[in-house]
Amino acid sequence: MDHNMFCFQCEQTAGCTGCTSRGVCGKDAQTAQAQDRLTGALIGLARAADTSPDAGPETWQLMIEGLFATLTNVNFDPDSLNALAGRVRAEKQRLVPDCAVCTAPCGRTGDYDLAQLWGAQEDIRSLKSLLLFGSRGMAAYAYHAMVLGYRDETVECFLSKALFAVGEDWSMEELLPLVLELGGVNLQCMALLDKANTECFGKPTPVHVPFTVEPGPFIVVSGHDLHDLKLLLEQTAGRGIAVYTHGEMLPAHAYPELKKYPHLKGNFGTAWQNQQKEFADLPAPILFTTNCLMPPRPSYADRVFTTAVVAYPDLPHIGAEKDFTPVIERALELGGYAETQHRTGLNGGTGTTTGFAHDAVLANAAQIVEAVRSGAIRHFFLVGGCDGARAGRNYYTEFVRQTPPDTVVLTLACGKYRFHDMDLGTVAGLPRLLDIGQCNDAYSAIQIALALAEAFQCGVNDLPLSMVLSWYEQKAVCILLTLLHLGIRNIRLGPTLPAFLSPNVLQYLVEHYAIAPITIPEADLAALLGS
């Protein structure tokens, strides 16, 4: 490929084919090349781990960090990416020291050139891309569990196995089972993260979260990392500083060990793709703990901080010591708003309710089962996934708005910002709109579906349940593979289908799982209710 770069891992990729000069996400060619070099080094490390008995927790931790750093909207800093690649190569040299001085290198532990992948036969490229991008998504979940002290050797070893396979000359018949295996391992990884979050922060319970911003100094925290939020809440306690969540951090309010802090006040803003407008005049610092960071505009760049694997050139970074003093001092310096700010969601709502994870929902299992049997609840819709800037995403707003009053809408991840401030009322004494949580809380949605299937003594595909999903980045890929691993059929996916799905691979998914693209809300609702 004769391009400055090549990347087609996210939903917004240029022309639905691939970014070749600059990423739609905002990364430049230099950053894309650094990500490819890091990925190539990770594949080299996986090759070394395959031959060395000394591979262990330190090896897997580097793989997890490296994969997470290449996720969309995480790391835009070539220097940071190159430094991480250097650490990866140093670990490889530790595992196979003789390879560094070999006079006749065999290439079995060498770095992989990603140009080989991007230029491969389209079906091979498609399956390897599913494997690589799904691994990046799963690594994000493994990272969040890891920082809480929870690890799973099966998950970590599989990531190495997947990276190794990307660098091999394998056939479709060899790659396809590994792609589907990733879905099963990711289910195990999401279960690990669910265990980590609930044991560290308590089981989520439903809570109303206001969009109002009170006067005085405050900090906005974006991303997914609950551990970082907890540390910030501890360090700001008693300082007269309020903390507001943003984006995927919203479900943090439902965890008892987080909501016990009275200065965790509410949620600021709408979905991640609106941040450049919403942060423009913000009199407060913003801390990014994970994706989705967009290139900050000059109007607010002096107020943005990063931590963990997130990085952007010239932005201050909070290191592993997690001393948030610079963020706190900036909040006090900026001072916040002088008067209360009454903000709304995209549909005019002044707040939202979150916290309907599997424990909270299944506590009402008997009531739900009876409501289905009596006909009070006709159908469940899982409308969730990533949000993004593509115009067609208003489909999800209209789909939810048009769901009949005898149906329940389950939602999760940042796609909910399209409709989570709507008042859909109640059905059978339950809210019609149930926000399960972050994208990794797809695990909760799966547990709810499995419990209902057990109650009705049927398979998940036989339930009055339809999945209408939106995707943007690589965590959506591993979740989709998990649903396929479970044999779930008739998923509606949008707003566009992944550019990395070749016609043959897409046809396989259609034939075996009946995956279909979204069309228009009215037609899809009629079809799904008819089924």
Residue ranges and their predicted role:
Residues 2-20, 27-31, 35, 181-531:
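Anaerobic metallocofactor- and corrinoid-dependent redox/one-carbon enzyme cores
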Residues 2-216, 220, 240, 247-250, ...:
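Long, compositionally biased, glycine/small-hydrophobic-enriched stretches that function as flexible linkers
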